[in-house]
Design a protein with these regions (language model features):
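Conserved acidic, metal-coordinating active-site core of Asp-based
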Residues: 93, 98-214, 218-222
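Active-site phosphate-binding/coordination module
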Residues: 19-119
Length: 264
């Protein structure tokens, strides 16, 4: 029996328009009534995820910023921040590649270290209040997420090069078709879900997770039942326990219904 279910957002739980299908909220509440916790596991920050789940935000859990922010029932149970040294080295490396552009995030703000118009347009779709800067934030600013926008779509090649250059400080994972997440070593969606599992006293075999991209790799490998979307990257589907349908067909919601039916 599953006691904790985690789902990625873009390309997984969200539909093709980047929206939460309305039935999702009822499913989350129904799962909770049966003793099953639901967690959104995403590269997005906690504050952004709360906007997606406003009707049920206090009745669910969050593994946000790729595991750097972990919340259970609205209470923080884990947080990880980047060292200023690591961020400085990342900024220096990214600056050498004309196709790469760095975005940094603290708990509520987004910082764009670039003035390239294409980059700004892309980021503004999701972060309308982002602040454009030309120097790194002060070391007193707690950075919880770092992402790199790849303006030519060469995310796999770029992630490989960055990993070779900065593997001591980061783990790089493609996220979608244009982004690369720069994660702290040992911090991932898997480490975040592990904190939730410890908080609730839940075993790995009692956890199910859904994902579609390479920043879902660790969590899909960690949980007892890892499910890759039909639209997932081939490497993720290869290591998943199951492959389910597409996000545009609300496949995650269908799987949640099946879990509920098994509990009836």
């Amino acid at each position: 029996m599953f006691k904790l279910i985690a789902s990625d957002m873009d390309g997984t739980l969200l539909n093709e328009n980047g929206q939460v299908p309305p039935e999702t909220y009822e499913l989350i509440l129904a799962l909770r009534e049966h003793g099953v916790h639901f967690a959104a596991s995403s590269g997005r920050r906690y504050d952004r995820l709360c906007e997606f789940f406003a009707p049920v935000r206090d009745k669910m859990d969050f593994v946000a910023a790729n595991g750097a922010q972990v919340y259970a029932d609205g209470k923080m149970v884990g947080r990880e921040v980047y060292s200023h040294l690591a961020i400085r080295k990342l900024a220096q490396a990214v600056a050498t590649f004309p196709n790469l552009h760095l975005a940094l995030f603290d708990r509520t703000k987004s910082f764009l270290l670039d003035d390239e118009s294409k980059f700004v347009r892309e980021v503004d779709k999701d972060l309308p209040n982002a602040e454009r800067i030309w120097e790194l934030p002060d070391p007193s600013v707690n950075i919880i997420k770092a992402s790199i926008f790849c303006d030519d779509g060469a995310v796999m090649d770029s992630a490989y090069v960055l990993q070779r250059e900065l593997g001591q400080f980061f783990t790089f994972a493609p996220s979608g078709n244009a982004w690369i997440d720069a994660m702290q070593p040992g911090v991932s969606k898997a480490s975040g879900i592990a904190q939730l599992a410890e908080h609730y006293g839940i075993g790995r075999d009692e956890i199910m997770a859904f994902g579609d991209s390479m920043n879902d790799y660790e969590i899909i490998r960690f949980v007892g039942t890892g499910c890759a979307m039909e639209n997932a990257r081939p490497a993720l589907k290869a290591v998943a326990d199951r492959v389910v349908g597409c996000n545009r067909d609300h496949a995650v919601q269908q799987e949640l219904r099946r879990v509920l039916e098994s509990l009836a």
